[in-house]
Amino acid sequence: MRVHLFAGMNRISKDIDGWELREVFVESLEYRELLRLRFNELRRPLDLEWTEAEGQADKLDRHFGLYHEEALVGSVVVVALDPGVAKLRQIAVAKPQQGRGVGQRLMIAIENLLVREGVKRLELNARVNVAEFYDALNYQRKGEIFEEIGLPHVKMIKLLRGNESA
């Protein structure tokens, strides 16, 4: 059971430096803020619009924001695939925060949360131009490069907690 500490979000973790990972609930004001970040960083540069089908799919997923001193700086969507397996998607960092370690902080925070929840394997489809970022976080490239939303992507997998069977 989730504890709803706020109308639109659940505080997951907070550190003394003002960084906080929050689960954000669909239809909340905070969710709309996450959508704006995702649109600005992932869709607008490609001239992509938001579709109704994507909105319906979003209702089935979990949404997280990384906040620094109450300002949203990053977001990630978590999709449960199988017991112990999750897919990360729509990973975004606000443009002014890019190149400052925010993406790494976001990934570590979500991985730590998911490990506590029993996830043993993470998957994601990385744009090829940022795959090295995930390489540095110990994600492994799997399979051939493929096209998604008109861009080359590669599937990447990470086994959590040293679990070597997946």
Residue ranges and their predicted role:
Residues 18-34:
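A short beta-loop-alpha structural element at the N-terminal edge
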Residues 24, 36-50:
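Helix-loop element at the rim of GNAT/NAT acetyltransferase active sites that forms part
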Residues 54-59:
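Short loop/turn motifs at secondary-structure junctions and domain boundaries
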Residues 65, 71-79, 87-92:
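Conserved beta-strand in the GNAT
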Residues 80-91, 98, 148-153:
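A conserved beta-turn-beta hairpin within the catalytic core of GNAT-like acetyltransferases
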Residues 93, 99-112:
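Conserved acetyl-CoA-binding loop-helix of GNAT-fold acetyltransferases
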Residues 107, 114-127:
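Conserved GNAT acetyl-CoA-binding A-motif
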Residues 123-125, 135, 140-155:
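Conserved catalytic-core motifs of GNAT/GCN5-like acyltransferases
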